[in-house]
Amino acid sequence: MAKQKIRIRLKAYEHRILDQSADKIVETAKRTGADVSGPIPLPTERSLYTVIRATHKYKDSREQFEMRTHKRLIDIVNPTPKTVDALMKLDLPSGVNIEIKL
């Protein structure tokens, strides 16, 4: 019989919130009797933006801004219906983006 697997990808700008959310998901899945692998840290995506400070001239004066996107991966193997219901009712912070693949 083929194993059923739920793959959850989490993305956030702050790694503390991301790790707390991942811990909540792992704890909920383990409590309901599913096998969990993760959270696996994925490479951090780094975006760098360079902006001219002045409005019209002085091109040599620039400012740089950086935005980091932290990512985690969680695999839930053989989830029970109880696991799926518990994950649907789980309350996570608004700064965390969640992608779920079955």
Curated annotation (Swiss-Prot):
Keyword Ribosomal protein attributed: yes
GO (cellular component) term, any one: ribosome
InterPro entries, alphabetized: Ribosomal_uS10, Ribosomal_uS10_CS, Ribosomal_uS10_dom, Ribosomal_uS10_dom_sf
Gene Ontology molecular function: any one: tRNA binding
Gene3D superfamilies recorded: Ribosomal protein S10 domain
GO BP terms, alphabetized: translation
Keywords: Ribonucleoprotein, Ribosomal protein
SUPFAM superfamilies: Ribosomal protein S10
Record-stated family: Belongs to the universal ribosomal protein uS10 family.
Binding partners and assembly: Part of the 30S ribosomal subunit.
Protein task: Involved in the binding of tRNA to the ribosomes.
Protein name: Small ribosomal subunit protein uS10
